[in-house]
Curated annotation (Swiss-Prot):
Any Gene Ontology CC annotation: extracellular region
Enzyme class: lyase
Classification lineage: Bacteria, Pseudomonadati, Thermodesulfobacteriota, Desulfobacteria, Desulfobacterales
Nucleotide-binding listed as a keyword: no
EC number: 4.2.1.11
Subcellular localization, as worded in the UniProt entry: Cytoplasm; Secreted; Cell surface
The species this protein was found in: Desulfosudis oleivorans (strain DSM 6200 / JCM 39069 / Hxd3)
HAMAP family membership: Enolase (MF_00318)
Gene Ontology terms: biological process: glycolytic process
Record protein name field: Enolase
Originating gene: eno
Binding residue positions for Mg(2+): D242, E285, D312
Function recorded in the entry: Catalyzes the reversible conversion of 2-phosphoglycerate (2-PG) into phosphoenolpyruvate (PEP). It is essential for the degradation of carbohydrates via glycolysis.
Lineage top rank: taxon: Bacteria
Length: 426
């Protein structure tokens, strides 16, 4: 009663008003699953390919009609009759049907939509919540949230070069308490920015996008907001950065246009080291560019003993690339994005590799999101440790936090909040 009998895709809009793919899967016993695919703004060059129509007169070239057609006419018929609880078989079949290294024939957005919807349909068939279906009896750890409250870089039209300034409510004992702490700091920050005459409009991921004079000024505002909200920086609430350094890497130099600086790889690491010495920065993501592979080892050696060094663009959730990074000592954490690799199975493989190698994992959204909260269930199902899903505003971000609160309630006394961080006081 779990055979796939119908696969139906459609074009919907994401949180930026751009088209994306949504897929419904129906099984022989009547179970159903629905999934919507996210989309990134700052993307790694080796990510699985998101198929767009490129017809400029329709959605300015960003339509996904071809990806939808591929699901409805090519992928669906091949999967009919296949058991939905054989996720690896389903995903391998789609990968084989595509036949390219980066899923460019059918589109990673087409393949991922089906992969996620199949997992949901199988969970429905077994009458299990998605997190329980994915993780079995071991699914009980809620992820520590990284909350992006100041946006810069490709996520905002301001002078900040660093893309995300996040808070981590390390002093929280439950996910509900973490969400409350984050919301209180977020709203306190809004008042502080407004009092200083800065705009409080939000960026793609729900964080504020003030036009500040430097990256350090943004950290200063966050420090003040933490204190004014009644929390201790480092002990109660830490700070994390996503530099997205590939976005400002030009001809072998890191060009911080907002600060008028042009830095070598070593100087860029010096820059981070100075910030870490002054502030409770617990995690730095994509501190160097994906093209600057060799210097990632240097950065990890210098900063990795005290700071989580997260690889996003440098690994793109790709098990083959990640395996090389593990072997060479790059980073000590990996960002996990479903649409970077394009199937649930390959995502689970990357997470398993990280755990075996002693890397932490951060389950992540994209800047273009929908109301789909799949990653919340995924984070709990795989005991992911951390989740990065935006600020404490915009319903596309809040949907994930709310789902985590529901899961925590369902787990009851068995729920455990993960905390990969040691309290840091600076």
């Amino acid at each position: 009663m779990i055979e796939i009998i119908e696969v139906q895709a459609r074009e919907i809009l994401d949180s930026r008003g751009n088209p994306t793919v949504e897929v419904d899967v129906t099984l022989s016993g009547g179970a159903t699953g629905r999934a919507a695919v996210p989309s990134g703004a700052s993307t790694g060059t080796r990510e699985a390919l998101e198929l767009r129509d490129t017809r400029k007169k329709r959605y300015l070239g960003k339509g996904v009609e071809k990806a939808v057609e591929n699901v409805n006419t090519l992928i669906g018929p091949v999967l009919y009759g296949m058991p939905a609880d054989e996720q690896f078989m389903v995903d391998s079949t789609m990968i084989g049907l595509d036949g390219t290294a980066n899923k460019s024939k059918l589109g990673a957005n087409a393949i991922l939509g089906v992969s996620m919807a199949v997992a949901r349909a199988a969970a429905d068939a077994y009458e299990l919540p998605l997190y329980r279906y994915l993780g079995g009896i071991h699914a009980k750890h809620l992820p520590m949230p990284m909350m992006n409250i100041v946006n810069g870089g490709a996520h905002a039209a301001n002078s900040l070069d660093i893309q995300e300034f996040m808070i981590i409510p390390v002093g929280g004992k439950t996910i509900a308490e973490c969400v409350r702490m984050g919301a209180e700091v977020f709203h306190t920050l809004k008042k502080l920015l407004k009092a200083k005459g800065f705009a409080t409009a939000v960026g793609d991921e729900g964080g504020f996008a003030p036009d500040l004079e430097s990256n350090e000024a943004a950290i200063g505002f966050i420090m003040e907001a933490i204190k004014k909200a009644g929390y201790r920086p480092g002990r109660d609430v830490g700070i994390a950065l996503d530099a997205a350094a590939s976005e400002f890497y030009e001809k072998g130099k890191y060009v911080l246009k907002g600060e008028g600086k042009k830095l070598s790889s070593k100087q860029m690491v010096d820059y981070y080291e100075n910030l870490i010495d002054k502030y409770p920065i617990l995690s730095i993501e994509d501190g160097l560019a994906e093209q600057d592979w060799d210097n990632w080892v240097m950065m990890t050696d210098r900063l990795g003993n005290t700071t989580q060094i997260v690889g996003d663009d440098v690994f793109v959730t790709n098990p083959a690339i990640f395996e090389k990074g593990i072997r060479e000592g790059l980073a000590n954490s990996i960002l996990i994005k479903l649409n970077q690799i394009g199937t649930v199975s390959e995502t689970l493989q990357a997470i398993d590799m990280a755990k075996q190698a002693g890397y932490t994992t951060v389950i992540s959204h994209r800047s273009g999101e929908t109301e789909d909260a799949f990653i919340a269930d995924l984070a709990v199902g795989v005991n992911g440790g951390q989740i990065k899903t935006g600020s404490l505003s915009r319903s596309d971000r809040i949907a994930k936090y709310n789902q985590l609160i529901r899961i925590e309630e369902a787990l009851g006394a068995g729920a455990v909040l993960s905390n990969d961080f040691t309290a840091v006081v600076r």
